[in-house]
Amino acid sequence: MKLNQKEQRFLRMFPPRMKQLENQIRLVKNCSRKDGYEWGFTDLVPNFFIVIFKDLTLCAKNFGLDIDVTIGGRDIEDIYDDALEKFNEYNAD
């Protein structure tokens, strides 16, 4: 089967971008090592994950995937706005 131009472009772009994402997740995971980092003093971690999970669920939806995310038993939709506000405060220029 011969792929059209859009299909070829997708196969050229999507896998490497997902590999980059996987790499970035691995780097973030390294920050969880308790021998090198301390994060228990801040709510930064849950707020950042809430924002990222929301972005990932919206991205997945664009590909036709329906993903439900809960954090501590709470639906991400219920806690996203507060988390985004804190995320933006930390990332303000």
Kindly give the residue locations of the regions a language model identified.
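N-terminal intrinsically disordered, cationic/polar leader segments
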Residues: 1-34, 38, 46-93
